[in-house]
Amino acid sequence: ILKTSGATYSILSKKDILDKINGIKNMFPSDWKLPNVYLLHGDLTDEEMNYLYNHPKVKAMVSFTHGEGYGRPLQEATMVGLPVMVSGWSGHIDFLNQHESLLVPGKLEKVPQSQVWENIIIPESSWFNIDTNSAYQGFNMLHNNIKKYQSQAKSLMYTNRNKFTLEKMTQKLDEIVNNYTSDMPQQVELQLPKLKKVKESV
């Protein structure tokens, strides 16, 4: 199952992705039995995403992202105990680890010129490219040891459900903000001295 889209959820975006899928499949000999690719294109509701995460045929979540600010879908997957295989770099490392998920190694490389996007992805930017051999090994490890990775994912689920509650994140944010603002000037109430009333002269 491939859930993705281009810059929009348009018909042209969907056609472009389908063309890319077919282009990749055509790189292999015609007598090879390739797996089916089911494209989910567009925006899904929270209920639909939850159904997808918990579908009995969905065994793991895989993302070879070049970089994430946070990676919400990845954390959502951990919250339901779904094994995660993902690029071993960027924001999602805050809630994933090598012992309870599969972090694929790679390296930071300059973005291709074709991916430069004005004011978004500048020519001097770098992004993370996975090591494809490690990714191949990761797929085999997941397939051959799914029970092991499901058990590890359950452990990570309990950790993240306890650690990333709204209450605890509010407390964490408060600690961070206080750490940087404790020495800032504070507003002080102006207290003028009390003066004795001057007697009127006769």
Put a short name on every predicted segment.
Residues 57-59, 81, 88:
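A short alpha->beta transition loop at the rim of the catalytic pocket in nucleotide-sugar-dependent
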Residues 6, 116-202:
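C-terminal amphipathic helix plus adjacent low-complexity
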Residues 66:
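Aromatic "clamp/platform" in nucleotide-sugar-dependent glycosyltransferases that forms part
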Residues 11-52, 59:
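Nucleotide-activated donor-binding/catalytic signature segment of Leloir-type glycosyltransferases, i.e.
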